[in-house]
C-alpha cells in the first residue's frame, strides 16, 4: 500500500470515530453554542481571552489575545510574535520573506508551532515559516517555554523546547444563527488583502465556520544601498523580487455537549512569491531572481469525552501535505537554472487519558504516532520515511499555594530510505519538572521554577541532502533551567490591572548540528560539533490605568537579556563569542488609549546589535534598530452590526534596518482596514 493511501485510511478511520460520537452524544445537554446571555457571561469569566484574566503557570507563558493583537499593528503571526520576550524572529524582509522563530537562542528547529493544539510538521528542515499564518481569524497566540501546565496535551508538544500555539476563533452567536466578519486591508507597496469569516449554527450543539482570504503585495519598497570601503557611499534602490500572492481557505466544524466536545478543521494555503536576495552592489538583480511556490493542506480532528467525572479521554488526528517548487533562473550551472520539487507528507495520531485521582491530584497518559515522508526530484534522492512513537506520562498537583507537575517523555524513532543508507533509530527518555509557589494568601505573588531535558532530531536535510548530509548525526540535546517570579493585582479602580513577570534562565546545547568543512572549504558536511551556553533574563509588564469611566490607558513592555556563547572549542577564534543573529539585548513596548471616540495604539520593537557569523568582529556586526508604529481606529454601531475603520503608520522613522544582514526591511508604510461584523 502506498504511503499516502495509508495516511488517508488512518485519518478517515479516526474521523469516523470522532464525528458521529461528538454530534449525536447521549446525556443531559448543556448548550454551549446557544445564545443565552447568562451562559455567555459564564464562559467569558473563564475565557483565556478575557482582558483581566489572572494567569497561573509554573513555566513562562506569554499570551496575546485578539484584543491585544489589534493594538500591535500586526498583519501576520510573525509580526505579533516579535512582542514576546525571549524571542528572535529571523525575518528576510517584506511580507513574503521567510520568517522563523527562535526562543531563548535554541534555534527555530526547537520551537513547535501548533494550530488549535495540534502541531505542524516539517521533517525536511525542522522550521515552520510563521509568515504564512494570518491574524485574520486568530483568537489567541500563546508561547510556552519548556511546556505549559496542561498535562493533557499531546506528547508531540511535550517533545519541543518551546511551543507557539495559534488558537483560532471559536464561533459565538449573540443572536440568530449566522454571524461573521468581512474585511479589506490595503496599503503601501501594492498591498491588498480582502478576507471573510462566516459562522453558522447548524444545531444547538453544532456549528460550522468558513474562512478565507487573499493577499497580494508587489513589495517594491525603496531602500538605501551602502557601498565603499567603509559604507561611506550610498545609492537609492528599489527592492526587487519581493512580491507575494497568498490564498487561504479554512473550514471547521464544532460540536459540544455536557460530557464531550469535538472539532474538525480543513486548511488550504497557497503562496507564490519571490525570494528577495541579499542587497549586493552591482549585483542586486541576479541575487533577487529566485521564485518559490508553496501549497499546504492539512485536515485535523479532535475529540474529547468525559467517561466518568474522574476520567477523560481524547483522540487527535492529522494529515498534512506540503508541496514546494523552487526555481533559480540564473543558477550558474550547465542547465542555466536550478529547479526542484519537494513533496512532504505526514500522518499523525494521538490518544490520551486524564485521570483526576483527587480534586488536587491528576495524572495523564498520551501516546502519539507520527509518519513523515519526503520526496524530491533530486538525483539519487533517499526518499526518507520517519516513524516516531512518542509517549508521555505526566502528573500534576494543585492547591491554593502550589502548582507542581512532572513529565517523562519516551521517544522511539526509526527511519527507512529507498536509496542509500538510512539513519539509525533512536530511543530516548526525557524528564520535565516544574512548580510555582504562592507564599502569601492575600498577595498574588508567585515564584516558579522548571527544568527540562529535550532534544531535536536531525532533519531530512541534515541527514540526506546531497553530499552535505550525514546519516551518522545524533540528536541535538538541550537542558533548560528557569527561575522566575510573577505578580498580578487589581490595585484600585484607577489602576485595575498590574502584571509583572521576570525569569532568569540557563540553557545548554550539546551535539549542536552545524555545517563544517571537511577536506577543504568547498567540501562541507553536517556534524555534531557545536556546544552553546546560554544565560539570560526575560522581563515583561503590563499596566492598565483608568482615569475616567470611559477612558482606559494600557501600557506594556518586554525586555530580554541573552548571552548565548559558542563554547565548542577553547582553541578556536570564536570561542565564547555570541552566536550569530542573537542580540544581547532586545525588547518591545506598546501603549493604547481607548476612548468612546477613537482608539490610538502605539507599538515598538527594538533590538541591540548582532553578528552575522560566529566571529564577533566589527566587520561582521549587524546594527541594532528601533521600529515604531502607530494606529487609530473606531467602531461604529449600525443596527446591531459593527463597522470598523483602522488606519496604521508602520516604521514611522523610515529606517531600512536589517534583521538579517543585507536584507533590508521596508521603511515607512501605511495601511488601512475596513471591516463589517454581523
Language model features with spans:
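C-terminal beta-signal and adjacent terminal beta-strands/loops
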Residues: 510-511, 553-555, 606-613, 621, ...
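N-terminal periplasmic "start-of-domain" segments of outer-membrane beta-barrel proteins
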Residues: 30, 40-71
Amino acid at each position: 500500500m502506498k504511503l499516502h493511501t495509508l495516511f488517508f485510511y488512518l485519518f478517515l478511520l479516526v474521523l469516523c470515530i470522532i464525528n458521529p460520537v461528538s454530534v449525536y452524544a447521549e446525556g443531559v445537554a448543556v448548550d454551549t453554542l446557544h445564545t443565552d446571555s447568562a451562559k455567555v457571561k459564564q464562559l467569558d469569566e473563564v475565557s483565556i481571552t478575557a482582558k483581566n484574566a489572572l494567569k497561573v503557570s509554573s513555566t513562562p507563558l506569554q499570551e496575546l489575545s485578539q484584543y491585544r493583537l489589534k493594538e500591535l499593528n500586526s498583519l501576520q503571526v510573525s509580526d505579533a510574535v516579535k512582542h514576546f520576550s525571549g524571542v528572535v524572529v529571523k525575518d528576510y524582509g517584506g511580507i513574503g520573506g521567510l520568517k522563523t522563530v527562535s526562543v531563548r537562542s535554541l534555534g527555530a528547529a526547537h520551537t513547535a508551532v501548533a494550530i488549535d493544539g495540534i502541531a505542524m510538521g516539517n521533517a525536511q528542515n525542522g522550521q515552520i515559516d510563521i509568515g504564512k499564518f494570518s491574524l485574520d481569524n486568530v483568537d489567541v497566540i500563546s508561547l510556552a517555554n519548556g511546556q505549559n501546565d496542561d498535562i493533557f496535551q499531546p506528547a508531540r508538544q511535550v517533545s519541543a523546547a518551546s511551543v507557539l500555539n495559534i488558537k483560532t476563533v471559536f464561533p459565538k452567536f449573540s443572536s440568530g444563527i449566522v454571524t461573521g466578519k468581512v474585511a479589506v486591508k490595503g496599503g503601501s507597496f501594492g498591498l491588498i488583502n480582502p478576507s471573510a469569516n462566516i459562522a453558522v449554527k447548524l444545531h444547538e450543539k453544532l456549528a460550522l465556520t468558513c474562512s478565507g482570504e487573499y493577499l497580494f503585495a508587489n513589495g517594491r519598497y525603496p531602500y538605501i544601498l551602502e557601498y565603499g570601503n567603509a559604507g561611506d557611499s550610498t545609492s537609492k534602490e528599489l527592492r526587487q523580487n519581493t512580491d507575494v500572492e497568498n490564498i487561504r481557505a479554512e473550514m471547521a466544524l464544532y460540536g459540544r455537549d455536557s460530557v464531550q466536545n469535538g472539532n474538525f478543521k480543513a486548511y488550504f494555503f497557497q503562496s507564490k512569491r519571490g525570494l528577495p536576495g541579499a542587497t549586493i552592489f552591482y549585483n542586486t538583480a541576479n541575487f533577487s531572481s529566485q521564485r518559490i511556490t508553496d501549497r499546504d493542506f492539512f485536515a485535523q480532528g479532535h475529540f474529547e469525552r468525559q467517561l466518568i467525572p474522574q476520567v477523560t479521554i481524547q483522540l487527535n488526528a492529522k494529515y498534512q501535505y506540503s508541496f514546494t517548487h523552487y526555481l533559480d533562473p540564473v543558477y550558474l550551472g550547465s542547465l542555466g537554472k536550478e529547479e526542484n520539487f519537494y513533496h512532504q507528507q505526514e500522518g499523525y495520531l494521538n490518544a490520551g487519558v486524564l485521570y483526576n485521582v483527587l480534586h488536587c491530584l491528576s495524572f495523564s497518559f498520551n501516546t502519539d504516532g507520527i509518519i513523515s515522508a519526503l520526496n524530491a526530484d533530486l538525483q539519487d534522492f533517499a526518499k526518507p520515511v520517519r516513524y516516531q512513537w512518542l509517549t508521555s506520562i505526566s502528573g500534576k498537583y494543585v492547591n491554593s499555594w502550589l502548582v507542581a507537575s512532572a513529565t517523562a517523555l519516551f521517544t522511539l524513532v526509526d527511519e527507512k530510505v529507498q536509496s542509500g543508507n538510512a539513519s539509525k533509530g533512536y530511543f530516548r527518555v526525557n524528564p520535565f519538572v516544574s512548580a510555582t509557589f504562592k507564599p502569601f494568601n492575600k498577595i498574588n505573588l508567585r515564584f516558579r521554577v522548571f527544568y527540562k531535558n529535550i532534544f531535536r532530531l536531525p532533519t531530512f536535510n541534515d541527514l540526506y541532502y546531497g553530499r552535505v548530509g550525514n546519516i551518522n548525526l545524533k540528536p541535538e540535546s538541550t537542558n533548560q533551567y528557569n527561575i522566575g517570579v510573577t505578580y498580578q493585582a487589581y490595585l484600585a479602580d484607577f489602576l485595575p490591572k498590574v502584571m509583572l513577570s521576570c525569569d532568569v534562565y540557563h540553557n545548554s546545547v550539546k551535539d549542536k548540528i552545524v555545517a563544517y568543512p571537511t577536506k577543504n572549504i568547498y567540501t562541507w558536511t553536517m556534524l555534531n560539533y557545536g556546544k552553546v551556553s546560554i544565560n539570560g533574563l526575560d522581563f515583561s509588564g503590563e499596566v492598565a490605568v483608568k482615569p475616567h469611566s470611559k477612558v482606559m490607558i494600557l501600557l506594556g513592555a518586554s525586555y530580554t537579556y541573552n548571552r548565548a556563547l559558542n563554547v565548542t572549542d577553547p582553541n578556536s577564534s570564536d570561542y565564547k563569542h555570541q552566536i550569530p543573529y542573537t542580540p544581547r539585548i532586545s525588547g518591545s513596548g506598546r501603549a493604547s488609549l481607548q476612548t468612546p471616540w477613537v482608539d490610538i495604539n502605539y507599538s515598538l520593537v527594538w533590538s541591540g546589535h548582532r553578528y552575522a557569523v560566529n566571529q564577533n568582529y566589527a566587520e561582521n556586526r549587524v546594527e541594532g534598530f528601533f521600529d515604531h508604529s502607530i494606529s487609530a481606529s473606531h467602531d461604529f454601531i449600525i443596527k446591531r452590526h459593527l463597522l470598523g475603520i483602522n488606519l496604521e503608520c508602520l516604521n514611522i522613522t523610515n529606517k531600512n534596518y536589517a534583521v538579517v544582514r543585507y536584507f533590508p526591511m521596508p521603511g515607512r508604510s501605511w495601511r488601512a482596514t475596513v471591516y463589517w461584523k454581523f
